[in-house]
């Protein structure tokens, strides 16, 4: 009975998401065999040019620079919707090419994770957006504490938008393949130390936030946000965009 109830809840959740124009992303990580990174990259680059040359079949790759996954590659598919998930497109030739020409250089890989981009908490994240580097912040929400997290992230986005923040920020929440209380905040940039700025003011982000939402709002909302997160989940890693292993749009 518990399994049946859980299945019904998940079906209702996914059906609701399907109706609201969800923007779907997928990602996984892989590790090249020792001493085989160059051969892997050469083979993967050929595969990318052959099978992933358009926006419809595009894939993006990042080198993970630190943390427990240092040295691995993050492969990402984005800007999709439910039509992509429901597609019956035959990809057997592409998959066979990978098995025959690339997989021999791969030591291990994770399973796919499916994400939904949280548009109302994202800023300057468009198909035309490009950047060389990215900070990936992983967080896990305590059960039942979504409201405090959503409240703070949503208000921050409103500050970004109103005051023309130049940074690139995207928030993604797991839909499948992992803990559904997990989300990531991705910040794209082209130079370390320059994530973004508010060009029209000298005020701090906290001051702008308080102007919009009331005295001490930033401190109060940030405290509630932090208390809503699992302590073990607060990790950040650097990723560098790998153009050779990515679709050139």
Name what the model sees in each region.
Residues 18-249:
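Short S/T/G/P-rich N-terminal loop/turn motif that feeds into the first structured element of a domain
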């Amino acid at each position: 009975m518990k399994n049946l109830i859980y299945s019904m809840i998940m079906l209702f959740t996914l059906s609701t998401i399907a109706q609201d124009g969800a923007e779907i992303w997928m990602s996984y990580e892989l590790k090249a065999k020792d001493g085989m990174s160059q051969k892997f990259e050469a083979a993967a680059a050929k595969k990318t040019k052959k099978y992933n040359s358009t926006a419809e079949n595009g894939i993006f790759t990042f080198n993970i620079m630190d943390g427990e996954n240092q040295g691995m590659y993050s492969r990402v598919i984005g800007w999709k919707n439910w039509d992509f998930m429901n597609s019956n497109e035959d990809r057997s030739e592409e998959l066979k090419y990978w098995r025959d020409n690339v997989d021999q250089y791969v030591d291990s890989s994770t399973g796919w994770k499916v994400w939904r981009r949280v548009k109302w908490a994202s800023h300057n994240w468009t198909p035309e957006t490009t950047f060389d580097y990215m900070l990936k912040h992983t967080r896990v929400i305590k059960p039942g504490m979504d409201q405090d997290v959503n409240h703070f992230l949503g208000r921050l986005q409103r500050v970004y938008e109103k005051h023309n923040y130049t940074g690139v920020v995207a928030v993604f929440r797991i839909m499948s393949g992992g803990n559904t209380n997990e989300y990531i905040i991705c910040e794209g940039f082209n130079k370390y130390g320059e994530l973004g700025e508010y060009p029209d003011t000298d005020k701090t982000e906290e001051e702008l936030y308080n102007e919009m939402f009331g005295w001490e709002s930033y401190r109060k909302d940030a405290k509630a946000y932090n208390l809503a997160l699992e302590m073990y989940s607060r990790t950040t890693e650097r990723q560098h965009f790998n153009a050779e292993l990515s679709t050139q749009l």
